[in-house]
Design a protein with these regions (language model features):
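A short, glycine-/small-residue-rich helix N-cap motif at loop->alpha-helix starts
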Residues: 57, 111-120, 142
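Donor nucleotide-sugar binding loop of glycosyltransferases
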Residues: 55-58, 84, 144
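Acidic donor-binding/catalytic loop of UDP-sugar-dependent glycosyltransferases
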Residues: 87, 132, 138-153
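N-terminal membrane-anchoring/stem segments of glycan-assembly enzymes
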Residues: 1-42
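Acidic donor-binding segment of Leloir-type glycosyltransferases
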Residues: 63-113
Length: 153
């Protein structure tokens, strides 16, 4: 009979521990929920630096995704190439024509700052960046419309 009493109290204790764990988990679960983005009016000015090289498949669509950002703060997109014959130049010019309200700059500078071409390209386009908040991105990715807001948060 004593064994049944001990088993009963053991299972009650385990049930209480499980209940306490569930209550604590419910209490602190809010810490892991995505926080809302700040109001658009308080967004920081951003310079987005995009070093380009060549005309990879889908480049126009990838670059266009950066032009379609849902971000109310000032945005400057600075594209950079090191070769005047780079096939990405006409794509950038088409974006400038398609999105005239955006501040889009194209920097052509073949100056080398070391053995890494991408780093040299970034160093060349840094001078054209007007804002303190800099976001760097490769040319071969597409992003969702809230990408810039999440990055600038």
């Amino acid at each position: 009979m004593l064994i049944f009493l001990l088993l009963g109290w053991t299972f009650c204790g385990l049930a209480l521990c499980g209940t306490a764990y569930a209550l604590l988990a419910a209490r602190f679960a809010g810490r892991f929920v995505k926080k809302p983005l700040p109001d658009n009016a308080s967004r920081a000015a951003v310079s987005l630096l995009k070093p380009l090289h060549g005309g990879a498949p889908g480049l126009a669509e990838d670059l266009e995704s950066f032009c379609r950002q849902d971000y109310a703060g000032p945005v400057q997109i600075v594209f950079g190439v090191q070769d005047a014959a780079d096939p990405s130049i006409p794509i950038v010019e088409a974006l400038k024509a398609r999105f005239p309200a955006l501040e889009i700059a194209l920097v052509l500078d073949d100056k080398s700052h070391g053995p890494n071409a991408k780093v040299s390209n970034l160093a060349n386009i840094m001078a054209a960046a007007r804002h303190d908040l800099l976001i760097l991105s490769d040319d071969d990715i597409a992003v969702p419309p809230d990408w810039l807001a999440v990055c600038a948060e």
